[in-house]
Amino acid sequence: MKKIVFAFLSSLFATVVRAQESQTEYNFLRLPLSAHAAALGGENITVIEDDPSLMFSNPALAASVSDRTVGISYMNYMHGANYMGASYTKTLGEKATVAGGVQYMNYGRMKETDENNVQTGTFNASDIAVEGIFAYELARNIVGGITAKFITSYIGHYNSMAVGVDLGLNWYEPEEQWSVSLVAKNLGGQIKAYEEDYGKMPTDVQVGVSKTFAALPVRLSATLVDLTHYNYRLADHLDLGIDLLLSESIWIGAGYNFRRADEMTVGKAEDASAHGAGFSIGGGINLERFKLNLAYGKYHAASSSVLVNLGYSF
């Protein structure tokens, strides 16, 4: 089992570089499922849009999604890995919103080797998270949200399970168009380990702010992530994004993730380069019933990813 896990984790180095410091499991939960969030650097918890994928970043944002909205997502990740998601949102009265969602990562087929690095076969690996989301207007302009999730992971014949919650809070001032959020993600733990040792959840605390300017069709966003790791430098917490709002329904965005750029940098001194990792771009159209959002980014110096979201309100 140790050889299998080692080969598996090594092939996904880009996902777990920083996570390995705390030996966390289920690091697919760190990846964005929202194309809009991905376009703005990969981390955003404050954009207020009728976009069902945004509630995977902050459960409080489910309150902005139209009644009876279906959303699906797909990302070609790296090394044959594919990341997918789906959701359904339903409003309950004027203040409450409920949703169900699923996140699925398929890592494809990989080599299984023995202690001498001799191939003995192949194995598949995948992660699944099934989620229930609830958002409620706590006060004027303030919405709270919670996501309860069941996670299971398969590496060959080995399986682990976990339960967790996300807690989100958003304050949105529509006249000045300020949005501020606080989110705690992946609070919980394993209920079944691969073997004897129980792993940790990829817990994260994030704070974010977005501001749309009345005189300009521009929205700026800043998000601080991994605030439980006090020893990181400030840049490793920072994610910046900008939206150009072409109309009420159409946006173009770009972002920069300082930590990802630093982690993906290869080479030494003047020859060091992240090969574009850290930068991301995207765009979308959110009509009354139909939504389409796309983002391009590099989660590894040697590969690129495209994330697509589709939504439809019945």
Q: Which positions does each model-derived feature cover?
A:
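Positively charged n-region of N-terminal signal peptides that target proteins for export
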Residues: M1-I4, R140
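Sec-dependent N-terminal signal peptides
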Residues: I4-F13
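Sec/Tat signal peptide C-region and signal peptidase I cleavage site
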Residues: T15-A19
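Subset of outer-membrane beta-barrel
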Residues: Q20-F314
